[in-house]
Structures are given as structure tokens and as C-alpha cells.
Amino acid sequence: MSGILGTGGGSGTPAGLVIALQETAPNVTTGVLAITASTTTASGSLALVPKGAGTLAGGALIAQVPDATATAGNVRGANAVDWQSYRVASTQVASGAYAVIGGGTQNAATGQFATVAGGSGAVAATYGKFAMASGSFASPGDAQYGCTVLRGITTGTTQVRLTADGTAPSATNTANLQDGHVYAARILVAATVPGDSPVTVVYEFTAVFRRRTGAQTTMLVGGVTEITAITDPDDLTAMADISADAVNGGIAVTATGSAGITLHWACTVQSTEVG
């Protein structure tokens, strides 16, 4: 069976849409219901707009109606986007505000602004984290790649902790480890004076962190290896330091400024995560 079920203005179909069911070859086994924008212009976009879009508490754009079970999952976060259609637990959804799951299976984006592009068994549980996995050993997130972007501002020789949201470090904004995990991290830090400035500060580190049960167990395994250290001009005293945060259970990236200047700092923490 194939054919047009409705066109704009007829059979209850909104103007500007063509809805067609295709069940002939090659769609005999899995039929396709096509919704096509029909505009008077040469090309036409198709927008799916949740109620409240453009506000802080806008609705989510989702592939299924939540049912609080593993079938369709829990309610999604405000302004979230979730195209994942298969899971084995109700929590495997984009439940964080502004979180995104592009597809795949058994993924969870629970942190605010967190992203899982696809794949299988990835968990992005902290602020702005990107996670990717191709499967897991026993539970989602126990074999994955993660990336978190941190930032902060120093004025003069002050010190500041770089965090994902630019505020004080917490249990969700400082490249936090999951319980029972080891993170092998590559940390790249850069800073400059905003505007047309020649000031350049770059540091690159590698380090291994372990967290058992509870934030207080977070620790460095071995030392921190400094791979790159660039400061231009040479008389800058700006520097970055890496340590374990046993209060919030994460990776602490601390920036120290240089006299007489304001520096904007950015940092990527890339982590190979296993548990």
C-alpha cells in the first residue's frame, strides 16, 4: 500500500503538509509514513516546535511519549532533544535541561546541557558533558569517552577554579568522576586577554584519576605529566595546576593569573572512562 493520506487543507491535514504512507518496495517490511512540507516557495523547511520553545521552561523535542518505563522512558528535561527510541531502563533519556541524545540505544544525558550524539551505553551526567560509547561491560558509562569544557577568569595574580558553568566548583560542574571509575585524562588549558591581545598561555597535561565510592575517595593515581607549557610574553606568571577534588569528586583545574592583566581561561578535559 502506498499513497497520499492527506494534503494541506483537506482531510483534517494542516495547510502546507503532505502526509503519505509508503508500504511498497523497498518499504514492504517496514513501512514509512512521510510528512513533507508543501510550500509555494522553491524550498520549504519543516519545524517541529514544542510549546514554550524560546523560554527557559520550554517543552522537549522527543521521539516517544514518556511512560515512565523502559519502553518510552521518563519525562525529558526542559528544552531537551531526545531521538533515542530504544532503552532498557526508564532513566536512559535526555532528562537534563537542554540535554541532547541524537539517537542510539541505552544512552542517558542527565546533566544540564549534556550531550550524547548516539552510540550505545553512554552517560553524560554532568554540566555540559559530551559522552560517547559503543557499548558497556555491565552498565552504561563503564567504557566511554567523555569531554567537558571548563572556563574561568583571573584578574591579576588571583587563582580561580575552572568549571563548566564558570561558577564555584560543585558535584556536577568540574569534570566529576562516577563512583567506581578510573579516568585517564588529557587536559588542555588556554588563556588570553580578551580583545586584540598578543598574550598567549597554553598548558597541556595528562593524568589518571580514580574514584571508588563517594567523592572523598577521588584521587590522582601517580603524578601529573606536563606536556606543553607556553607563555607569551615570557615574563607572564600565569599558570595552570591539576589536582584531585575530593570534596566534589572530580578533576580540579586551577588557573593562576598574571599581574596587571585579566585573563579568560578555557580548558577541555578529555577522558577515557572505565568502571
Residue spans for each PLM region:
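Surface-exposed, low-helix, low-complexity loop/repeat segments of extracellular attachment proteins
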Residues: 1-58, 66, 216-226, 235-242
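Surface-exposed ligand/attachment interfaces on beta-rich extracellular proteins
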Residues: 29-42, 91, 138-183, 190-202, ...
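Parallel beta-helix/beta-solenoid repeats that form elongated, surface-exposed shafts/blades used
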Residues: 29-49, 55-75, 79-94, 98, ...
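Periodic small-residue-enriched repeat registers in elongated scaffold domains
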Residues: 57-173
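Edge beta-strands of jelly-roll/beta-sandwich modules across compartments, strongly enriched
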Residues: 261-269
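Short beta-strand-to-coil "C-cap" segments at the C-terminal boundary of structured domains/repeats
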Residues: 269-275
